[in-house]
Amino acid sequence: MTTPAAPRRPFFRRRKTCPFSGPNAPKIDYKDTRLLSRYISERGKIVPSRITAVSAKKQRELAQAIKRARFLGLLPYVIR
């Protein structure tokens, strides 16, 4: 006869904090291609916020900055 095991708590993954919020967080600027390229996939697509843990407001700013940099030719639209 076996004894009942203690009930398991469900696995809780802690939400990462937004890298653009905080006292010394970097500003999102369309001219900062090194920062923007960290949020673009290998194929040139904008990485979703559920992967990068960027807040919704900052994700919109980030997407606008990436699109602006693409339009000005600072970032590529597609990476082959």
Swiss-Prot record:
InterPro entries hit by this protein: Ribosomal_bS18, Ribosomal_bS18_CS, Ribosomal_bS18_sf
UniProt entry tagged with the keyword RNA-binding: yes
Keywords: Ribonucleoprotein, Ribosomal protein, RNA-binding, rRNA-binding
Membrane-spanning ranges: none
Gene3D superfamilies hit by this protein: Ribosomal protein S18 (4.10.640.10)
Chain's role: Binds as a heterodimer with protein bS6 to the central domain of the 16S rRNA, where it helps stabilize the platform of the 30S subunit.
Protein name: Small ribosomal subunit protein bS18
Organism from which the protein derives: Beijerinckia indica subsp. indica (strain ATCC 9039 / DSM 1715 / NCIMB 8712)
